């Protein structure tokens, strides 16, 4: 600690004593705060309904056609479905716990193995003939040649395609742009080989390659999110050409969700969420060489898929297939581009079931599944019959949900906790804690479909912010918690652009401040004021928000509000850095901001840059002393609202890092408890030391399970999650 200079004349001995004391005050380490509590693991949480974005198919060694249905989540749950008998053949965990499995697309190799592109960033090879516990192999592993050179490009895998040589292509999303990675399973004596097909990325400025299709030596890639386009790649030379796609095809799209190519036709999905007919009815038919729209008899070829999902079928040279509601009946349709007509192949499919690119296992057998309820539809084409799966031997659903990582958590008056998971679900997790851990109770009340990004509540209202619809859903608060039976909702913006309501903070009993980010994250977010009593919202995008001082204009552009506190008629809001928040060479111009917003004038009144080298102000809280405390994951700071200055700060040189994601910070009895760098840390509001890690992340061979979603329970304990499990930190009695 720095001490003030002395002005008195000291004796020599006094000077020596004083110098020694001063030296000790500077060099002696501060004693780290230890709350003296203990961590308790609550019982295993029940999984929500299955998350099944896509399914695969293959044929077993004995000739049996099967569906490969993976429920996404923590480790995933693999179901093998017999398509002949329409029964469940087996169910087992796909891979070990702490592996994030999100089954976005499948493709089948000539050896009948199934490749799974996972949103967790892995490529899995599945052999359904293998013994239990040995069916899946994670190919995204440093032991595979070339993987370490491409790992940074595979944060998320969206799609997968294979060529006639069994080379596998995956579409990726990363902070280094969207890439196409190629995996050759036969290279290096069967050890495989990873390569980056187009070094430098597919399209400058795009973080995603969203869709792939392969045909006759050429790979087609659909990009997003700023300027969606289609790239045609010669897989022999890796020469890439951007197709001249008509602007009407991509107008209004944030990405190209589905491509399919068959018999000289390139099918491009154009579905935009909403109630209006999408361009081309959902799928445009283009020339795969030029990108021009295909015509027949003077009319553009269009397919009324609505959902953009077009798939091919073994043994069919030209026709493609899709599902659609016809006269309120879910049907499987066959489209013939030679006549530009469709016919019904089967009726009575599950209403939420949608096809995947490998839905046809054979010319006879088709399977589809509902993304958020795993409602299965199995079609036998010869008789046009469509049926689901019977219940399993225990009377439960044949397709069951996998444990999923908890990503949002809140505590409400009355003692209950409410949580939501990564990936959308039509329910919430309600937890009723008990002093005896084994008496904790769980339930899964129904709620609007979505991924809850943030919770907020007052004495009168309980509010959830859900992705991808960008809606706020409000419920009345009862004596024992929210009354979930009745709810109303409102979109933050009519076009659902602001799709991630991360921060929801009460202003008074009826009003909430909301900080939202765009669906695809880069770009400006928005600050909203939500009137729950009247279900009305006023939204202020940060790129057009009003300033009391014109000289501040533009300082918040290209940033997203991640943390908010309310104090005496003002909001204090912490933002991300500009762009995607991942710039390692952050400058003053691109750094995260802390700003003050006047609720009366609805204008930004003050803006500061606390740290230019950080990625986000991930959490803010109001202390009992009226001080605003915040963190970036690497720094903790105290800000005085009166003069809008940083009074003190502490760099977390041990076990800290500059985080980009929102977190939580709570002040209790002069101690800050916050999630920083994936750990729960306790430190004094004096910020004299780095504090103590009271709950660390868990390390397993599959990876780390970070601490997240902190809440202060009605019982005075801290509750938080690691993976799919909830924990609490109990303070000493008294």
Roles of regions detected by a PLM:
Residues 33-90, 368-369, 386-410, 417-419, ...:
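An edge-strand/N-cap motif at the start of beta-rich repeat modules
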Residues 66-70, 113-116, 167-171, 219-222, ...:
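Conserved beta-propeller blade signature
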Residues 71-73, 120, 174, 225, ...:
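Residue-level signature of beta-propeller blades and closely related beta-rich strand-turn architectures
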Residues 271-281, 514-525, 574-591:
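Short, conserved, GDST-rich strand-edge loop motifs in beta-rich repeat architectures
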């Amino acid at each position: 600690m720095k001490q003030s200079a002395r002005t008195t004349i000291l004796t020599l001995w006094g000077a020596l004593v004083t110098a020694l004391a001063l030296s000790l005050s500077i060099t002696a380490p501060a004693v780290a705060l230890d709350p003296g509590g203990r961590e308790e693991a609550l019982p295993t949480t029940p999984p929500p309904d299955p998350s099944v974005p896509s399914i695969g198919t293959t044929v077993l060694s004995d000739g049996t056609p099967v569906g490969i249905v993976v429920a996404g989540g923590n480790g995933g749950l693999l179901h093998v479905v017999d398509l002949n008998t329409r029964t469940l053949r087996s169910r087992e965990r796909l891979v070990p716990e702490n592996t994030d499995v999100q089954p976005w697309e499948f493709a089948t190799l000539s050896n009948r193995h199934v490749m799974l592109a996972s949103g967790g960033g892995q490529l899995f090879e599945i052999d359904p003939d293998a013994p239990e516990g040995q069916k899946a192999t994670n190919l995204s592993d440093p032991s595979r040649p070339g993987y370490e050179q491409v790992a940074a490009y595979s944060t998320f895998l969206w799609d997968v395609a294979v060529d006639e040589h069994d080379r596998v292509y995956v579409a990726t999303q990363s902070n280094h742009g969207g890439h196409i990675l190629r995996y050759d399973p036969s290279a290096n004596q069967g050890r495989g080989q990873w390569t980056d097909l187009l070094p430098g990325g597919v399209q400058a400025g795009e973080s995603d390659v969203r869709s792939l299709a392969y045909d006759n030596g050429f790979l087609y890639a659909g990009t997003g999110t700023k300027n969606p386009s289609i790239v045609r790649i010669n897989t022999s030379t890796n020469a890439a050409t951007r197709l001249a796609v008509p602007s009407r095809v991509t107008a209004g799209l944030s990405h190209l969700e589905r491509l399919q190519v068959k018999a000289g036709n390139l099918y491009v999905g154009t579905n935009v969420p909403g109630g209006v007919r999408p361009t081309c009815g959902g799928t445009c038919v283009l020339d795969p060489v030029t990108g021009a729209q295909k015509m027949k008899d003077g009319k553009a070829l269009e397919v009324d898929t609505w959902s953009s999902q077009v798939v091919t079928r073994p043994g069919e040279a030209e026709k493609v297939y899709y599902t659609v509601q016809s006269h309120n009946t879910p049907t499987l349709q066959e489209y013939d581009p030679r006549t530009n007509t469709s016919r019904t192949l089967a009726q009575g499919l599950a209403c939420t079931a949608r096809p995947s690119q490998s839905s046809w296992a054979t010319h006879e057998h088709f399977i589809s599944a509902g993304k958020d309820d795993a409602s299965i539809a199995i079609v036998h084409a010869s008789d046009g019959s469509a049926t689901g799966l019977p219940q399993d031997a225990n009377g439960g659903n044949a397709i069951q949900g996998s444990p999923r990582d908890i990503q949002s958590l809140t505590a409400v008056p009355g003692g209950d906790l409410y949580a939501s998971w990564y990936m959308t679900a039509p329910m919430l997790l309600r937890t009723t804690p008990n002093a005896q851990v084994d008496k904790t109770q769980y339930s899964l009340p129904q709620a609007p479909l979505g991924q809850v990004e943030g919770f907020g509540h007052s004495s009168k209202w309980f509010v959830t912010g859900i992705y991808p619809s960008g809606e706020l859903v409000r419920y009345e608060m009862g004596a024992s918690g929210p009354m979930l039976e009745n709810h109303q909702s409102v979109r933050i913006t009519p076009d659902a652009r602001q799709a991630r309501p991360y921060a929801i903070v009460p202003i008074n009993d009826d009003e909430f401040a909301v900080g939202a980010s765009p669906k695809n994250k880069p770009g400006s977010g928005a600050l909203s004021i939500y009137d729950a009593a009247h279900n009305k919202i006023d939204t202020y995008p940060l790129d057009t928000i009003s300033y009391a001082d014109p000289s501040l204009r533009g300082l918040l552009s290209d940033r997203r509000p991640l943390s908010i506190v309310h104090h005496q008629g003002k909001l204090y809001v912490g933002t991300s850095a500009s762009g995607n928040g991942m710039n390692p060479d952050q400058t003053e111009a691109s750094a995260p901001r802390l700003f003050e917003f006047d609720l009366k004038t609805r204008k930004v009144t003050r803006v500061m840059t606390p740290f230019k080298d950080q990625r986000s102000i991930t959490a803010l809280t109001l202390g009992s002393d009226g001080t605003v405390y915040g963190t970036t994951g690497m720094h903790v700071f105290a800000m005085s609202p009166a003069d809008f200055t940083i009074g003190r700060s502490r760099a977390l040189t041990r076990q800290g890092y500059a985080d980009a994601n929102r977190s939580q910070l709570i002040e209790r009895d002069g101690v800050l408890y916050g999630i920083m760098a994936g750990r729960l840390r306790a430190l004094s509001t004096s910020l004299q030391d780095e504090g103590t890690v009271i709950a660390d992340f868990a390390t397993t061979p599959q990876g780390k399970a970070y601490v997240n979603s902190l809440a202060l329970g009605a019982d005075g304990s801290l509750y938080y999650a690691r993976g799919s499990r909830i924990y609490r930190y109990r303070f000493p009695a008294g």
